[in-house]
Amino acid sequence: MLMGCSSTGTVNADTLKYSSWQFVAKDTGAKHEPIRIEFLDAFRVNGFAGCNRFFGQGEVKEGQLFVTDIGMTRKLCDPDTNEHEQAFLNMLQIGVPLQHSQNELVLLGDSKWHFKLVKGHFD
């Protein structure tokens, strides 16, 4: 049996539950801690958005990830980080198509947001 890197198109909450993902920055000279997202019990979602920690209730519907009831810390960071963080959180709130493979999660917003699996976090 041959297996590729992309999903078969079937992504649901059970596929992502108990997993942790870290944003793979295009710019390797990033000065800030990378964005992280975790999917927990009852599909609660939490993570770090670049400047602030966030949490909310996740749902996967028709191949899109939605996060509602988002709460977050309120630190003020540099304008570029704040803009990147806000774009990420807005994308989660309005819903974003996603692709999933064993070690990669891609959020297909205005641009592709690539995340790699953080191994050992929930093992």
Q: Positions of the model-derived regions?
A:
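Lipid interaction determinants
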Residues: C5-D123
